[in-house]
Amino acid sequence: MVQEVENNNNNNNNNDHLVQSSDPEHPANLIPELCRKFYNWGWVTGTGGGASIRRDEHIFIAPSGVQKELIQPHNIFVLQFPTPKYPPSDRKYIRKPLELKPSACTPLFLAAFERGAGCCIHTHSQWAVLVTLLVEREKGPDGCFEISNIEQIKGIPRGKGKGMMGFFDTLKIPIIENTAFEEDLTGSLEKAMDQYPDTYAVLVRRHGIYVWGDDVAKAKTQCESLDYLFQLAVEMHKLGIPWVK
């Protein structure tokens, strides 16, 4: 079971008011709801994956090592934004749940927020993992995922302020190599962001994907669209149908 945080401590000392709200759209309520959905979709199995939301000067983050379908608002970490990515000891946590660990995804989420994102999602989708393996086999380790002439591509932005992609556009998602520790992915993620400035996602080989958006709804729907495209790509590959027409 998820490690429950007892609320008998002094609420003022840990800024618990930051995660207490009756508003269903509050980040502390949205993150548990999102994680339950992602668990049911097979995206965050076995405590893997995570989600984070930026609201003004605060960043709300799901904890590490917790069964994602059981997360509650009082399990959420809160960071002051902006905050240093490294070292971890310099990060400006203004709320830390007792007995829980900060997410290892934190510096990667921060990389997305530093580029203007309002929400960042990390999944361990099997379809995302499979396409990274197929790309490596077909294009080598430097290849990116590409697909065109599929209607669902319209659910992905062309880039900041550039509208949405069209049916005939070719979607490109960069792929970075996995590392033994999640935090060590940060440099490669930022490099991919620089090389593909219009991307809203980065695949991690044999691991999963990071997807971000201007707000929660956009990050979620983009993640859904990408997962649909990855699954379709795997099935197309089985049938010998090329991804780019």
From Swiss-Prot:
UniProt signal peptide: none
GO MF assignments: methylthioribulose 1-phosphate dehydratase activity; zinc ion binding
Record: active site: E151 (proton donor/acceptor)
Sequence positions that bind substrate: C105
Pathway field: Amino-acid biosynthesis; L-methionine biosynthesis via salvage pathway; L-methionine from S-methyl-5-thio-alpha-D-ribose 1-phosphate: step 2/6
Domain of life: Eukaryota
UniProt keyword annotations, A-Z: Amino-acid biosynthesis, Cytoplasm, Lyase, Metal-binding, Methionine biosynthesis, Zinc
Coiled coil: none
Name of the protein this chain belongs to: Methylthioribulose-1-phosphate dehydratase
